[in-house]
């Protein structure tokens, strides 16, 4: 299993790189043929590859993903084992979960069980969401092979909302006539503290400003600024509360 996990980890697969995601499913299928004795089907869902092994109408679904966060080349070496701890991009989330699920499929009735691996989970499952929801409604059980930080059984997870806020200002020369400009950077910075105030630690709701970009040159009043926001919560009520506040 470790050798198979190593092969997957050393095949880097950031969500944004379609060729890399296709390659990691190819590697996964090579491992599948060795472990199961047959290959999975690679289907296309809104232009993205999805690995599907087993029934198209399963009673039980083992749900995984093989895309990762980090851009190619972010880690060296890609694979390291120290004692009983393996490290590398995707080891924890969630290539090890895929390998465990694949080995669990040995000896199972593939007419009743399916193992699915998507390639857009780290960016919100925008293209695979419909597929996941449809197959989940039909199945008796869906087991998501996501690890937890302390090794306990994960029985739920937060929903995620992503926002991008854009401010349009007015450009002007920062030295000659700054008073004629409207500074988009200043205006968007006023929003940050208001966003942070929306979090609710007791209910587990987080609102995190992440990427902010603004300006064009060092001597120009910024005419445009944007801010990305990552919000997560356990309930739809909290997600709606945050959304309403942001849109207000």
Describe the role of every protein-language-model region.
Residues 6, 29, 99-102, 106, ...:
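Predominant activation on well-ordered alpha-helical scaffold segments within soluble catalytic domains
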Residues 3, 10-17, 41-43, 147-148, ...:
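Metal-dependent amide/peptide-bond hydrolase catalytic core
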Residues 67-69, 120-122, 170, 234-236:
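Short coil/turn motifs at secondary-structure junctions
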Residues 90, 94-162:
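Acidic/histidine-rich catalytic neighborhood of metal-dependent amide-processing enzymes
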Residues 55, 79-80, 93, 133-137, ...:
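Solvent-exposed alpha-helices and their adjacent loops that cap or buttress functional pockets
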Residues 1-91:
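Acidic/His- and Gly-rich active-site-bordering loop/insert found
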Residues 60-62, 143, 170:
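Residue-level marker for buried hydrophobic side chains located in beta-strands
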């Amino acid at each position: 299993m470790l050798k198979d996990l190593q092969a997957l980890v050393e095949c880097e697969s950031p969500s944004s790189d379609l060729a890399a995601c296709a390659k990691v499913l190819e590697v996964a299928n090579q491992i599948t043929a060795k472990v199961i004795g047959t290959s999975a089907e690679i289907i296309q869902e809104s232009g993205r590859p999805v690995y599907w092994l087993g029934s198209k109408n399963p009673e039980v679904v083992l749900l995984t993903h093989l895309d990762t966060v980090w851009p190619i080349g972010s880690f060296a070496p890609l694979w390291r084992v120290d004692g009983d701890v393996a490290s590398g991009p995707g080891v924890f989330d969630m290539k090890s979960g895929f390998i465990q699920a694949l080995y669990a499929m040995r000896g199972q009735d593939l007419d009743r069980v399916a193992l699915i691996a998507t390639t857009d989970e780290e960016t919100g499952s925008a293209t695979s969401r419909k597929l996941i929801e449809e197959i989940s409604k039909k199945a008796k059980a869906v087991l998501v092979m996501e690890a937890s930080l302390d090794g306990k059984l994960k029985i739920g997870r937060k929903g995620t909302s992503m926002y991008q806020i854009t401010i349009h200002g007015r450009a002007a020369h920062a030295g000659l006539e700054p008073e004629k400009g409207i500074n988009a950077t200043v205006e968007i910075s006023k929003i940050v503290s208001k966003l942070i105030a929306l979090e609710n630690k007791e209910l587990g709701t987080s609102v995190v400003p992440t990427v902010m970009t603004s300006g064009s040159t060092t001597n120009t009043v910024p005419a445009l600024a944007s801010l990305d926001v990552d919000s997560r919560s356990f309930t739809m009520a909290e997600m709606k509360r945050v959304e309403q506040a942001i849109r207000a």
